[in-house]
C-alpha cells in the first residue's frame, strides 16, 4: 500500500511543475524515481535471501582485503550518483528549481543548516566525552594519522552527500508528492518516516541489537519529518542528519 501511494504521489508531483511539452508523459516520469529506488532495494533483499548470503561476513572479507576506508568510500560513492540523479531529474524533468524542493523560503537558509549541525555535533561530542570519562575501559586508543586523514576526508565530503540524498528523497521528493496527493501533512509524515526507518532494517546493528533499534530509526524519521513540515524547509533536517551521521 505504501509503495502504491508513493508511486501515485510521485506521479502527482510530476503533474504540477512539468511543462506542456512533457505533460503527456507525466505518468512515466513520475514512476521512474520511486520504481528505480525501491526496485534496487527489493532486488538487493531478494538476492541476499535467495542466495543465502551472509552480508556481515562478506563485509568483513571486503574490509580485510581492501581496508575499511576504501570499503566506506565505495559504499558512499553510490550516493553521489543517487543525489545527482535525483536533483537533475527534479530540475530538468519536473522543471522545478532545487530551491523549491529544499525550502518554501525565498532562498535556502544556510544559517538554519549550520545551527542544527552545530547543535547535534556539540551534543554528540559532549556525550562521547562524558561516556569516555565514565567508562574508560570501553575505549582503546588506536590513533594512526594516515588512516585517520583518509577517513576524515571521506567523512567530510561523502557522508553529507549520503544524508542529503536521504533527506531530498524522503523529506523532499516523496513528502511533497504524497502531500499533494493526500492534501494533508499527516499521511506524508507517517509514510515517509516509517519507510525511512524500515529501510534501516537491513543495517548490521539491527542483527546485533535486535528489532527494538527500529524504534530509533522510525522515530528519527518522524523527528526529521516534523522539523521539515513545521519549519517549512529542509535546512534543519539536512544539518541534523549530516552531523548525526558524522
Where do the PLM segments sit?
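Contiguous N-terminal and early-domain "leader" segments and peripheral loops that mark the onset or edge
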Residues: 1-31, 145-178
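N-terminal, membrane-interfacial amphipathic/helix-forming hydrophobic leader that caps
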Residues: 1-97
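Alpha-helical transmembrane spans of integral membrane proteins, capturing the lipid-embedded, hydrophobic core
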Residues: 4-5, 30-41, 76-84, 116-128, ...
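Alpha-helical membrane-inserting segments
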Residues: 6-10, 39-47, 81, 85, ...
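Membrane-interface elements of multi-pass transporters and channels
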Residues: 9, 13, 17, 42, ...
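Interfacial aromatic "cap" segments that immediately flank transmembrane helices
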Residues: 27, 31, 107-121, 186-187, ...
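Transmembrane helix-loop-helix hairpins at the membrane interface
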Residues: 34, 152-246
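Juxtamembrane helix-loop-helix connectors linking adjacent transmembrane helices
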Residues: 58-69, 74-76, 98-165, 175-176, ...
